[in-house]
Each structure stands twice: as structure tokens, then as C-alpha cells.
From Swiss-Prot:
Biased composition (Low complexity): 7-16
Keyword set, alphabetical order: Transposable element
Protein name: Insertion element ISR1 uncharacterized 17 kDa protein A2
UniProt cross-references to InterPro entries, sorted A to Z: Integrase_cat-core, RNaseH-like_sf, RNaseH_sf
GO molecular function, one term: nucleic acid binding
GO BP: any one term: DNA integration
Regions annotated as coiled coil: none
Top-rank taxon: Bacteria
Keyword Nucleus: no
Organism: Rhizobium sp
Biased composition (Basic residues): 19-39
Positions of the UniProt region annotated as Disordered: 1-47
Amino acid sequence: MLGAGGRHLAVGRAGRAGVGRRHPAARAARHHRQRQRHGVHLERGPGLGDDTGVGWHYIAPGKPQQNGFNESFNGRLRDELLNETLFRSLPPLAPCGGVATRLQRAASALEARVADAAGLCRSAHRTQRPACCVVDGCADRPLANPADHSSDQPRTLVMAG
């Protein structure tokens, strides 16, 4: 079987691809060293790189594509962990990452000038309580309005066939 660069590879008994008999040991060792990762690009400093002994350097200014894999991983992790669960209020969310602490920091950063948004909304809509006046949390509203049985989409004719 031909591997990268036309090199011959053989599959051993354990099912792993290894260097075949046509390669001398020196070429096999050099090939292995060339394929190893010698360093990583880091955005904010050494982090875990110092502990593992892997060489590192900062991402070059103006080269955001070097951080693309990290951002992709972070987005997928966020989708799997946070966006999968609907929280009805903030207390169940608190163990997920210190939300209360972040909210307190945000309020102190604004010098406690955070307005009561639900109260302002209720005073603006005195006759009835519309869907924008959610007090409990972000997932209190139903996904489909039970009072509205109409569709936004025009009806399509099904062809008889």
C-alpha cells in the first residue's frame, strides 16, 4: 500500500499502519520525526504548553485563520453543552459557569444603573401582557403560540398524481 509521498506502508497484525520492509530503520525514524508536531500557535500565552514541554508562539497579528480550529471547536462545544438545554430561569444555570457572578460584575460595571426591563415593558403594555414581558427567564414563552392557529406561509396545492 502506498502512503504519503509514495512511501510503502504495511498494515501489521494489530491493524495499525507501519513502515514496510522496504524502508531502512533510519528512514523510518526520520519519517516519524517529520510527522510529529513540533509546536503550537497560542492566542493568549503559554497556557498548558509549559507543562507539556511543547514549543509555542503567539498567533501572528492579522492572521485569524490560525485560530480557526479553536473557534470551531469552541462553537461546537457550546452547541453541545449550552444550547441543548432550555433554562427557565437563572438559578438552574448557575452551576453551569458562575452566571450569578458574571451578572453581578456586569451590574457593578454599569454602577447599578441596570433598568428593570420587565417593569418598563409592563408599563408600556398596560392593556395586556404580550410575549415580550417575560419575567422568569429566557425560555418561558412557548415556541408556538397556542392562540394563533394560522400559518405565516401561503398554502400550496398538492398535485394529484
